[in-house]
Amino acid sequence: MNKTSRTLLSLGLLSAAMFGVSQQANAHGYVESPASRAYQCKLQLNTQCGSVQYEPQSVEGLKGFPQAGPADGHIASADKSTFFELDQQTPTRWNKLNLKTGPNSFTWKLTARHSTTSWRYFITKPNWDASQPLTRASFDLTPFCQFNDGGAIPAAQVTHQCNIPADRSGSHVILAVWDIADTANAFYQAIDVNLSK
């Protein structure tokens, strides 16, 4: 094989590898409505957010929550150090959206579609402490809403109808999780809400 052929072959392999990486890297999404903590950073309703304001679709970490996945204290950032600001937790740190308990729509915007295992929604316990970092102990560990996709490729916009538990009121965090079927990862979106009946 001559030098030109080797160079062309190397460039071809490099291009294929980069295409594969870019395809995986583009498989992202965020909760558009009610706007997640990360998306509200992009909208500048949340401030001092760091780099997540430019890429709310990239809050991605290991799947398997609550048995695996992000470490306690790093759940909102999906354990991604570049988005550490999302893990800051005080009663007044994040803009809260007013929602009512009962039926609500949750809409994901996918910047690229990806084979999906499930979509799951967790909520903080009635007695959670809003002044402490989010941990598994903060949440009911059984999702209040779940949709299984069995590996299907979703549309670019996905809306789920979910019933927020009636025994919640006031400040809460809803954790929306998009579990990817063909990678070890999931996308995590914290949604800050103020609930009433």
UniProtKB/Swiss-Prot annotation:
The keyword Signal applies. Keywords: Carbohydrate metabolism, Chitin degradation, Copper, Disulfide bond, Metal-binding, Monooxygenase, Oxidoreductase, Polysaccharide degradation, Secreted, Signal. GO terms for cellular component: extracellular region. It is found in: Secreted. Residues 28-193 form the Chitin-binding type-4 domain. Residues 1-27 form the signal peptide. Binding to chitin is mediated primarily by conserved, solvent-exposed, polar side chains, including regions Gln53-Ser58 and Leu110-Thr116. Lytic polysaccharide monooxygenase (LPMO) that oxidatively cleaves alpha- and beta-chitin with C1 regioselectivity. Catalysis by LPMOs requires the reduction of the active-site copper from Cu(II) to Cu(I) by a reducing agent and H(2)O(2) or O(2) as a cosubstrate. This is AA10 family lytic polysaccharide monooxygenase CBP21.
